[in-house]
Amino acid sequence: MTPKQVERIKNKITKIKRELSADKKRWGGYYDDSRGLRYLPPELYLKISDYSGALRYYNWFDKNFPDDCGFPIFLFEWTITLFKTKRIKQAEKKAMETFYSNTYLIDKFLNKEFLDFDKSENSNWEYSSLAEQLIYSKDQNELIDFADWLENFIKTEKFYAFANKFIGIESVLKTEPIGEKRTKLVKEKYKM
């Protein structure tokens, strides 16, 4: 990437931050951001390999949008950022959140066959088609170290236990009628 391209990306980030600041002023100290601008900067930071900038942005996001769980690709970018800034325990947790939000993204990144199991996909964020929008791959030079770490992490007992529990709950929820058992399963899923 040329210095001019890096400068353009930095200018985009600045413009988005300005628009978010104006949005907060417009709404009397609160954000509306119905355009979803808050989700754009991480991809831009990652394009220029500014992982500390991305981390600062995620800290800001967490503080200003505490009830926003993000969307799967955003969470995946957060996982990359945490890994690249040597926050491995947090990266593990975020990788599991990514899997929870979309079971296909990690497989897509690692060029693996999609995990196929019978589950209900209640949100368009959960569909396999979302994974096709992932612009990151284990083959990208700047992500080789992350890919190695992620490949190893998804083979750990910690990840297996999490994934198996999640898949088990999802499989039962697909056919479980409304009632006490379903309510208990939903609560258990949201505690994960």
What are these regions (language model features)?
Residues 38, 75, 82, 113-114:
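TPR repeat positional signature
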Residues 43-45, 81-82:
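Residue-level signature for tetratricopeptide repeat
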Residues 1-3, 30-39, 69-75:
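Generic helix N-cap/helix-start motif at coil->alpha-helix transitions
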Residues 21-32, 59-69, 96-105:
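Solenoid-like repeat scaffolds
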Residues 82-106, 132-136:
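TPR/TPR-like (Sel1-like) alpha-helical repeat modules
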